[in-house]
UniProtKB/Swiss-Prot annotation:
Name this polypeptide is given: Uncharacterized protein MJ1123
MF (Gene Ontology): methyltransferase activity; S-adenosylmethionine-dependent methyltransferase activity
Entry's family note: To M.jannaschii MJ0638 and MJ1252 and M.tuberculosis Rv2003c.
PANTHER family: METHYLTRANSFERASE
CDD domains: AdoMet_MTases (cd02440)
InterPro entries associated with the record: Methyltransf_11 (IPR013216), SAM-dependent_MTases_sf (IPR029063)
Pfam families, alphabetized: Methyltransf_11
Length: 205
């Protein structure tokens, strides 16, 4: 049993206990989300799919999937690097705090590109490794049941991967400018380099 199966309820509860952080991430991602048919890789408990009206998700955790399905999301148990979909099926794609757990992050983005329609958008949320928050998570990850096996990426690395794979119109927004327990309001800025959480979007041409 993987850690996300074992602690699915605890993971989901974290977002209730840290509501400002959750709302901050939603707000940063929302600026990139287009209309149309969306898919989320690593849909987890559906915390991000539901507010963005994403009806279908992929995850490897069956216990997480059960919670997501209670939120009205259809979950397919599969890996993000090997999606069970035809080419050019979706208008947009969300990968939120999942790349850091991928065996091959670039392959996951490449697979997302395959199932995206032309003109479709990929939206990626990360804890920026180069940020104060990323450095803090990196230092403490051995003590974390969730992030122990994470390989954090920087916003620069993700942007570089997107460019290498031929994506265009790359944009970023950032949030969480203080330690998590000190954040008292939702604040989002364009770009990256200050915030701990970065949302990056790009277009398939």
């Amino acid at each position: 049993m993987n850690v996300f199966d074992k602690y699915a309820e605890e993971y989901d509860k974290w977002f209730d206990e840290n509501e400002i952080i959750y709302k901050s991430e939603i707000e940063a991602l929302k600026r990139h989300i287009p209309k149309g048919r969306g898919l989320e890789i690593g849909v987890g408990t559906g915390r991000f799919a539901k507010p963005f009206n994403i009806k279908i998700g992929v995850d490897i955790s069956k216990e997480m999937a059960k919670i997501a399905e209670k939120r009205g999301i259809k979950v397919i148990i599969a890996k993000g690097e090997d999606l069970p979909f035809k080419d050019e099926e979706f208008d947009f794609f969300l990968i939120n705090t999942v790349l850091e757990f991928a065996e091959n992050p670039k392959k996951m983005i490449e697979e997302a590109k395959r199932v995206l329609k032309r003109g479709g958008k990929i939206i990626i949320g990360i804890i920026d490794r180069d940020s104060f928050l990323g450095k803090m998570y990196e230092e403490k990850k051995q003590k974390s049941k969730f992030y122990k096996d994470a390989n954090f990426l920087s916003a620069k690395e993700v942007i570089e991967m997107l460019k290498e794979l031929g994506f265009k119109n790359i944009k970023a927004t950032q949030t969480i400018f203080k330690e998590i327990d000190k954040v008292d309001k939702v604040e989002v800025k364009e770009g990256y380099g200050e915030g701990g959480f970065v949302a990056i979007s790009a277009e398939k041409i």
